[in-house]
């Protein structure tokens, strides 16, 4: 099986060649993620919400440990999104405990998992319920000239970056996409729910990345065209762009963005030449598109441009760059880093990342 690389799975950079190189994730503390949840918790109800810190542990394993310790089935453990294994992450989980007292969760805790807070709420935590993720990244072994590096950081803070799905979505060497293609060609869906979700996500993400790569290559990823579907940063709704919408000041302010397709049933609802481009993509990947539609995936949209909120940086040591920023839920910190630096292999992970 051929191994798929970064350009196969993502696409070209928008801001030019990397300014240098560094190591990310030499240790878990080099990649810290804090889930941002904008839900007021009532303090009462049949769902126990847990604010959990984990190190070197993926979200699914943390959920299994919490479920075992609480004595509940896995279907009664919920979380908003997956977080990277090779990282220090803090995120919410909820346990459905109707008519039950708070359980002793000590058996779930250890050096790699700590429960920082517990509270009750009337509803379970839904997938995708978090508003954003806050990142603190420590890039070590830095080899780059300071002036062009600072200039690049200022540029991406002002202009954003292409909102690619990161390599983590596709598995080691693109293995999840290879498996998705195999399923599509055989018209099969895995019986295992986690595998099914992983393969469908990989196929859908690949199609989006291919469309975004085309627009990055021609320089239109951050500009609205007539026929584009536009969306605000934190909204899943979208509207068709005419000439007036293409002049909306909120595009320049990075509040409003052109979108690309997350493939599902039916043709994309885009218009004019944008629809032609998206249908041409479907024509190059007919099996994958049919498979996604048959799986019952609804056609959705994703913003092409990723605004970076609160980007700050400093150099705690001459060869260390520390970045802090916030991204909308579902977006990848690694696609921000790739517009700045090349990552050397040491310390990189093959495990699912924050989304």
From Swiss-Prot:
It comes from the Bacteria. Keywords: Isomerase, tRNA processing. One of its GO terms (cellular component) is cytosol. GO terms for molecular function: pseudouridine synthase activity; RNA binding; tRNA pseudouridine(13) synthase activity. InterPro entries: PsdUridine_synth_cat_dom_sf, PsdUridine_synth_TruD, PsdUridine_synth_TruD_CS, PsdUridine_synth_TruD_insert, TruD_catalytic, TruD_insert_sf, TruD_pseudoU_synthase. One of its GO terms (biological process) is tRNA pseudouridine synthesis. Pfam families: TruD (PF01142). It catalyses: uridine(13) in tRNA = pseudouridine(13) in tRNA. PROSITE patterns: TRUD, UPF0024. Its EC number is 5.4.99.27. Residues 160-306 form the TRUD domain. Responsible for synthesis of pseudouridine from uracil-13 in transfer RNAs. Belongs to the pseudouridine synthase TruD family. NCBIfam families: PRK00984.1-2 (NF002153). This is tRNA pseudouridine synthase D. It comes from Pseudomonas aeruginosa (strain ATCC 15692 / DSM 22644 / CIP 104116 / JCM 14847 / LMG 12228 / 1C / PRS 101 / PAO1).
